[in-house]
Amino acid sequence: MALMKTKFNLKRRVKLAQGLWLMNWCCVLAGIALFSMGVFLKIELRKRSEVMDNDESHFVPNSLILMGSLACALNAFPGKICYDSLDPTKFPRWKPMLKPYLIICLIFNIFIFFTGVVCFLTRGSLESTLAHGLKNGMRYYKDTDIPGRCFLKKTIDLLQIEFKCCGNNGFRDWFELQWVSNRYLGGRSKEVKDRIQSNVDGKYLIDGVPFSCCNPSSPRPCIQLQVTNNSAHYSYDHQTEELNLWSKGCKEALLNYYTSMMSSMGGMVFLVWIMEMAVMIGLRFLHTCLETIANPEDPECESEGWILEKSLKDTIKSSWELVKSMGKLNKVETAGGEEAGVATVS
């Protein structure tokens, strides 16, 4: 028994064709929106590529750009089919193309669903990418005179100011690395020499942070050096007092920014997926109800439309049998080829 068999008269067929035509062009606009979102996300990721460890994070924007382009191309084509389906003289030329087109639509809908899922599941890989990228960026913060790294100081400073964050996980990350270049330390100073010699790796480590970690909303002048030294500042206790530094780490700030953006885009992708599924089902109904018209010369006559010619269970069973028969045929051909090869050698 056919799945979701429905009777169609001329009026219902016309309404179905007109509704599908409108939905197809809505899907084209949705495809443009997907493409635009992919381009925007790619630009946002490229802006901060210096603090990202690899290019894996570009899978989502690339997928959105591809899905948007395909949505525009695939939905412009059935718009013409729906328009011509109302004319009995024009529709027959589209008949051979409809089944292959519906198969392509099914594959496209699977991929667009997968893209939507990835938008929501990308947080884990993005977190790892940002953690490693920010760590490397902070390590090279001091290298303002080394080609290829001289821009990182500006990048990190602008990042911390824009996202109101400090360090990777927090401001204490700056205490664990040398962020002041040796050329600005004054190597002859006894204090500098003692601090470098006291470190196993020979680095100049201080309990200080770059200026970009300072919170301008604080009423107190920024304490960016000797942050943990209470005696160095008047009426100050770093353990009880709210510091005038950003407390949030940049990894958390960037992660929240990108994941909220990708979640919104994921919602949009699923909305487009629902629209595409509706169009595909509608096209299947249109295809079958036009094929089952008893008398093509009488457009007023009733016809039947369905999604699957058999029940879902029977369709899956017959599809599995087809796959198995194709597998057996492939084995027979392989065996025949091997026998022919042996005969040639002998």
Curated annotation (Swiss-Prot):
Localization terms from the record: Membrane
Cited InterPro entries: Peripherin/rom-1, Peripherin/rom-1_CS, Peripherin_LEL, Tetraspanin/Peripherin, Tetraspanin_EC2_sf
Membrane topology term: Multi-pass membrane protein
Cytoplasmic side, ranges: 1-24, 81-99, 291-346
One Pfam assignment: Tetraspanin
UniProt keyword annotations, A-Z: Cell adhesion, Disulfide bond, Glycoprotein, Membrane, Transmembrane, Transmembrane helix
Transmembrane annotation, as ranges: 25-43, 62-80, 100-123, 265-290
Example of a GO biological process term: visual perception
Glycosylation (residues): 229
A single GO cellular-component term on record: plasma membrane
Tissues where this protein is expressed: Found in both rod and cone photoreceptors. Specifically in the rims and incisures of rod and cone outer segment disks.
Domain of life: Eukaryota
Covalent S-S links between cysteines: none
Role: May be involved in the morphogenesis of retina outer segment disks and the development and maintenance of the retina ultrastructure.
Family: Belongs to the PRPH2/ROM1 family.
Binding partners and assembly: Homodimer; disulfide-linked.
Protein name: Peripherin-2
Organism in which the protein naturally occurs: Xenopus laevis
